[in-house]
From Swiss-Prot:
<keyword id="KW-0143">Chaperone</keyword>
<dbReference type="GO" id="GO:0006457">
    <property type="term" value="P:protein folding"/>
</dbReference>
<comment type="subunit">
    <text>Homodimer.</text>
</comment>
<feature type="region of interest" description="Disordered">
    <location>
        <begin position="1"/>
        <end position="25"/>
    </location>
</feature>
<dbReference type="InterPro" id="IPR000740">
    <property type="entry name" value="GrpE"/>
</dbReference>
<dbReference type="InterPro" id="IPR009012">
    <property type="entry name" value="GrpE_head"/>
</dbReference>
<dbReference type="Pfam" id="PF01025">
    <property type="entry name" value="GrpE"/>
</dbReference>
<dbReference type="GO" id="GO:0051087">
    <property type="term" value="F:protein-folding chaperone binding"/>
</dbReference>
<protein>
    <recommendedName>
        <fullName>Protein GrpE</fullName>
    </recommendedName>
</protein>
<dbReference type="GO" id="GO:0042803">
    <property type="term" value="F:protein homodimerization activity"/>
</dbReference>
<dbReference type="GO" id="GO:0051082">
    <property type="term" value="F:unfolded protein binding"/>
</dbReference>
<comment type="similarity">
    <text>Belongs to the GrpE family.</text>
</comment>
<keyword id="KW-0963">Cytoplasm</keyword>
<dbReference type="GO" id="GO:0000774">
    <property type="term" value="F:adenyl-nucleotide exchange factor activity"/>
</dbReference>
<dbReference type="GO" id="GO:0005737">
    <property type="term" value="C:cytoplasm"/>
</dbReference>
<dbReference type="InterPro" id="IPR013805">
    <property type="entry name" value="GrpE_coiled_coil"/>
</dbReference>
<keyword id="KW-0346">Stress response</keyword>
Length: 180
């Protein structure tokens, strides 16, 4: 036989790593360290998730505030303008006998209409009250009268002062007389 074939027939000895038996204390220490690191990782992940949730909540809150500001931003101005509308309405109810008074009344009517349009353009609307069913959210009853055929119970008989709404928010309820 040739040398190569003889070498091929020799038993192959594998290099096996001989493991030293580890002591239980070393295994326990490593297991404890792994558990500690796993706990730290879990805590960090929980903190991260909480921070993400807080950021999302802050963004939602900010969007709500911006939406409310856009929707109700004119509220302060509207509350100050509404009494002016009342004064202009009262001025328009005055009877005039001469031309100069009529011209003045026409000018007041123009101002009233422009102001009313500006309020409507900003979603500030007069509350419909005359002849409608009494709604305590929209109307403030300042007087009651007996109900009759023309005015059934719980309906508005007369509007003493107009009420106004900004979008879905009541700025001032209408002061009304209600049939009982």
């Amino acid at each position: 036989m040739s040398k190569k074939k003889a070498e091929d027939k020799q038993p192959i000895i594998k290099d096996e790593a001989v493991e030293e038996p580890k002591s239980d204390s070393k295994v326990n220490a490593l297991s404890a360290k792994i558990a500690e690191l796993q706990q730290q990782l879990d805590d960090s992940q929980n903190d991260y998730l909480r921070a993400q949730a807080e950021i999302q909540n802050m963004q939602k809150r900010s969007q709500k505030e911006q939406s409310a500001l856009a929707k109700y931003g004119a509220q302060r101005l509207a509350k100050e303008v509404v009494p002016v509308m009342d004064d202009l309405k009262r001025a328009l109810q005055v009877q005039v006998d001469n031309d100069s008074g009529q011209q003045l009344k026409t000018g007041i009517e123009m101002v009233y209409k422009h102001l009313e349009k500006a309020l409507n353009d900003n979603d500030i609307k007069e509350i419909d009250a005359d002849g409608v069913a009494f709604d305590p959210e929209l109307h403030q009853a300042v007087q009651t009268v007996p109900a009759d055929d023309d005015h059934p119970a719980d309906t508005v008989v007369q509007v003493l002062q107009s009420g106004y709404k900004l979008a879905d928010r009541v700025l001032r309820p209408a002061m009304v007389v209600v049939a009982q």
